[in-house]
Design a protein with these regions (language model features):
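Membrane-embedded helical hairpins/re-entrant loop segments and their flanking transmembrane helices
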Residues: 45-74
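Short, small-residue-biased leader/transition segments that mark boundaries at the very start
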Residues: 3-6
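Transmembrane alpha-helical segments and their short flanking loops
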Residues: 12-31, 48-50, 68, 82-191
């Protein structure tokens, strides 16, 4: 893929004795950019949703799903979340699922473009390498810190949508009528 080629080209710049900068022909969009900043913790960067489920959910379904999903999510496996929440065919959860990687790509691109984070070479890490560790390996402490930033952002992007879904689940579990008033009451109890 061209992203892998971009990583290799970045490595060639270093091998030639030049600094890896945009001025020297360095590339921003590489395989590491995609793997470690757009799909980290799985497609849609769902770790924010998982953290909500584990620590803040009121519904039994979300609490249990969060506990079952936190382990796989740390290793970039999020199928339990994608299909059990569900995110698939769910217009409420589709919004943060799409928006989160877009926001992450803009923030990551900016960080690389401005030099806050060094451009990535051809160092590849296995796709199951947990975040923060993978950031350290592909770009040093700056990339690890950037992962902390984008993963924290994922929590706040997912938060209003997760609260709505949790309120729907909680109302159903407690046999409450699903009305705006009921949902607002349950949402107010979250975070």
């Amino acid at each position: 893929s061209s992203d892998v080629c971009s990583s290799d080209l970045n490595t060639e710049i270093l091998k030639s004795g030049k600094d890896l900068t945009l001025a020297n022909g360095g590339h921003i969009v590489t395989q590491q950019f995609l793997d470690q900043f757009l799909t980290v913790t799985g497609a849609g960067m769902t770790i924010g949703l998982v953290v909500f489920m584990v620590f803040f959910a009121k519904s039994a379904q979300f609490k249990q799903l969060g506990r079952l999903s936190i382990g796989p999510a740390v290793f970039n496996i999020n199928e339990p979340i994608v299909f059990a929440t569900p995110i698939v065919m769910n217009p409420i959860m589709a919004v943060p699922f799409i928006i989160t990687p877009i926001v992450s790509s803009v923030v990551t691109y900016f960080a690389l473009y401005t030099g806050l984070v060094p451009l990535f070479t051809a160092v590849q890490v296995p796709w199951t390498t947990p975040p923060i560790i993978s950031g350290l390996l592909v770009g040093g402490w700056q990339a690890a810190l950037l992962q902390v930033v984008v993963l924290t952002m994922s929590f706040f992007i997912y938060l209003p949508f997760a609260k709505k879904m949790d309120a729907l689940n909680y109302a159903e579990e407690t046999n409450q009528p699903i009305t705006e008033e009921t949902l607002e009451k349950v949402e107010a109890q979250n975070v």
